[in-house]
């Protein structure tokens, strides 16, 4: 099911990236991921708890079919939002958003930050989830909220721009860079 969601989202993202623009898609993706993570956090924090074999407790989503369905829908929303927006668009955007004088170095740094972020999530999720799965999703929701602010404040729209135009945008005041 998640693979189908990913495939559909990637196709939609490919079809929309040059029509709608990078910035609106990233903003939609961030808002959708934030909403999905908040819903998941609330479900995991409020669901009845069941004892685990190794000690501790975990949310018992089987005790309430509605909670299980909501958690699945939220998971699909998150996966689809990421797969259709941040997953592929970030790579397009980092190749377009930097002025020529710094494009090579900035693209390398941005790609490295993306990989480091993925590594950090992969490394921290099991540890945080063992502590509290609901709180883990809440922390990631806060990060998704920060991505909304990041897009609103710092990400310029690069749709229909020549790479050389990024020099002018980089030299302009921040407010005029966000079209």
Predicted regions and their residues:
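Alpha-helical transmembrane bundle of multi-pass membrane proteins
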Residues: 1-179
């Amino acid at each position: 099911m998640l693979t189908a969601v990913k495939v559909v989202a990637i196709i939609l993202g490919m079809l929309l990236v040059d029509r709608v623009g990078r910035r609106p898609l990233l903003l939609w993706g961030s808002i959708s991921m934030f909403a999905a993570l908040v819903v998941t956090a609330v479900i995991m924090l409020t669901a009845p708890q069941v004892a685990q074999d190794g000690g501790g407790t975990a949310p018992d989503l089987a005790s309430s079919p509605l909670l299980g369905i909501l958690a699945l829908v939220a998971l699909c929303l998150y996966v689809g939002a990421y797969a259709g927006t941040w997953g592929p668009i970030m790579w397009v955007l980092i190749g377009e958003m930097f002025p020529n004088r710094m494009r090579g170095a900035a693209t390398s740094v941005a790609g490295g930050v993306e990989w480091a972020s993925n590594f950090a999530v992969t490394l921290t999720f099991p540890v945080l989830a063992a502590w509290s799965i609901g709180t883990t999703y809440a922390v990631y929701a806060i990060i998704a909220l920060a991505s909304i602010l990041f897009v609103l404040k710092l990400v310029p729209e690069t749709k229909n721009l020549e790479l050389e135009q990024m020099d002018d945008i980089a030299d302009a005041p921040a407010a005029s860079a966000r079209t």
